[in-house]
């Protein structure tokens, strides 16, 4: 009698476990109720199921944390954008009212002070932008000037080298023996040697 009750309780427990497995871990093989010889195997399966359940819970918690974090970031961005849009709309409406009152000549002291402050701030921004543009232009001019000076210096150096070479070439020619009369060494070209008249020179040519 006690054996049958024990067997029945085993089947009931197995059915409950299989039901949980099918809901939580679809696809996991079902546990079969066996006799006491396979109690060790059942114990190892129970441990495996327990580990799988814990791992699944951890993964679910991690996914929930990621989803919550992502939702929080999205919500924060929406709130920030909504606030910025609201501020821009309010500022636009305020400027339109100021413009209308200025055209009608009905500005209050408070509106006039705010308008002057706004104009001053915009002027400072414009000056800042102009200054940045001037700095950029000045930097470009400096770069162009440096580039121009570099090219000019290179051209000057080449010109100096050419002049030096020409001068050196002329000096070498002047000091060379080729410029002397090869017939009468030591005489200046164009002059007749001593004892030789121009007439003799001409007769020789005849």
Curated annotation (Swiss-Prot):
GO CC, alphabetical: nucleolus
Spans annotated as Disordered: 178-206
Keyword Transcription regulation attributed: yes
Keywords, sorted A to Z: Nucleus, Phosphoprotein, Transcription, Transcription regulation
Highest taxon of the lineage: Eukaryota
Known function: Involved in ribosome biogenesis, probably through modulation of rDNA transcription.
Family according to the record: Belongs to the RRT14 family.
Name of the protein in its database record: Regulator of rDNA transcription 14
Name of the encoding gene: RRT14
